[in-house]
Amino acid sequence: MNQFFTKKMAATSCIIMNTFLLLIHIGLFVFFVYYHIRYMYIFNVFSMVFYACGYFFVWKEMLSQYFQLVAVEVMLHMVLATICLGCGYGFQLCLLGMVPVYFYGNYFSMQVQKKKVHGIFLGILSMILYIVVYAREHFRGPYYVIDDNVQFAIRICMGVINFAIIILCMSLLIRHVIASESELLRKADYDALTKLPNRYYML
C-alpha cells in the first residue's frame, strides 16, 4: 500500500461515502412515503438496512465486496425508481454519476486489499441499464405521476448529487496522481540507503 492509500484513509473515505448514501436513502424514503410510492419505500427500507450494515464491511476491511454491493444497490434502486416515476426526476443520472466511483473503488480496493471491483464491467452495465430505462419509458411510461414542481426539484437535487460525486472522485484521483508523482520523483532524486541526492538529482 502506498502512502496515499493508508488503511485509516480507506476506512475514513468509506465511512463518509456510506454515511452520505445512507442520508440520501433516508431522504428518499421520506419522499416515497409522503407520495405513497409503495414499491420504492419498501425497497428503501432494505437499502437503509444495507447502508447501516455498510459500516460492518468497512470495519472488517471488506472493501471490494462493499463497493460491488453498493454498485448493485444503486443500479437496482435507480432502475426501479425510474420505472416507477420516469426519467423526468433524474434518478437515471446516478447510473452515470456512479461510474467514477466504480473505477475509484477498483483502484482503492487494489491498493488496500489487492482485490478488484471490476470497474469496467460495472460501468458497461450502468450504460446498458441507462439505455434500457429510457427505452422502457418511451414505450410504457411511468407508473406514478407527481406534480411538475416536485419533479423539477428532485431533478435538480439528483443533478447536484451526481456532480458532487463526480467532483469528489476526480479530485481524490488527481490528489493521488500528484502524490504518486511526488513520491516517484523523490525516490528518483535521492538514494534509498544514504538519503542523499543521487546523480539523477544532479541532472
Labelled PLM ranges:
Residues 186-203:
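Conserved nucleotide-binding and Mg2+-coordinating catalytic segments in signaling enzymes
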Residues 16, 125-126, 163-167:
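Hydrophobic alpha-helical membrane-embedded or membrane-associated segments
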Residues 157-185:
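Juxtamembrane or sensor-core-proximal signal-transducing alpha helices
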Residues 21, 25, 50-51, 57, ...:
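Hydrophobic transmembrane alpha-helices
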Residues 41-47, 152-162:
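Alpha-helical transmembrane segments of polytopic membrane proteins
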Residues 7-64, 70-71:
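Hydrophobic alpha-helical transmembrane segments of multi-pass membrane proteins
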Residues 33, 37-40, 59, 63, ...:
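Transmembrane helix-loop junctions in multipass membrane proteins, especially transporters and channels
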Residues 1-7:
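Short, Lys/Arg-rich, polar N-terminal cytosolic tail immediately upstream
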